[in-house]
Amino acid sequence: MKTSRNFMLSIAIVALVFTGCQQSQQAKEEKGQTQLDINKENKRIVLDFYQQMFGDKDLSAVDRYIAPEYIQHNPAVADGAAAFKAAAAKWFEGQPKTKIDVQHIASDGDLVFIHLKNKNADGSLKSTIDIFRLENGKIVEHWDTQQDVPKESANSHPMF
């Protein structure tokens, strides 16, 4: 009986979340935005942010693109826009501006996935994948992973 009640409660929660997401999507579409429009705009926001922040080393990009309550899943950086800005200030010390080398970008609703080719200080390459969640034109959540590109590979497929 208890298992049945827990199952029904789980179903009810999923239904409520789905309904809320669907209503939010319907509200955007009523404003004349299609899902394609939203995906394109979210990709543009992430591309602009990434170049300004990581390419141009412009810390004020945080103020323009990152929500104050920013959720950070990278264990080396604390939550919040201010904490992210402080961490980036340390990363950028002595670093030159650069053109961001985007290999792939995709979006699915409020999520944007970006795959980049980066150079390490020694000139070797690094593959970076970032995932951003956006709300109302601001980045509210972030996940990332990085991998050095090995000199040799077990297969003939490039990382980029």
Model-identified regions with their sequence ranges:
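Bacterial N-terminal signal peptides
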Residues: 10-19
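Short, surface-exposed coil-to-beta transition loops
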Residues: 98-100, 124-129
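Short beta-strand edge/turn micro-motifs at domain boundaries
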Residues: 129-155
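A solvent-exposed, acidic/Ser-Thr-rich amphipathic alpha-helical stretch
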Residues: 59-64, 68-107
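Bacterial N-terminal signal peptides that target proteins for export
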Residues: 1-8
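Short beta-strand segments that buttress and anchor functional surface loops
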Residues: 114-121
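Short, solvent-exposed coil/turn segments at beta-strand boundaries
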Residues: 62, 107-111, 132-140
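Short, low-complexity N-terminal intrinsically disordered segments enriched in polar/charged residues
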Residues: 21-52, 56-64, 156-160
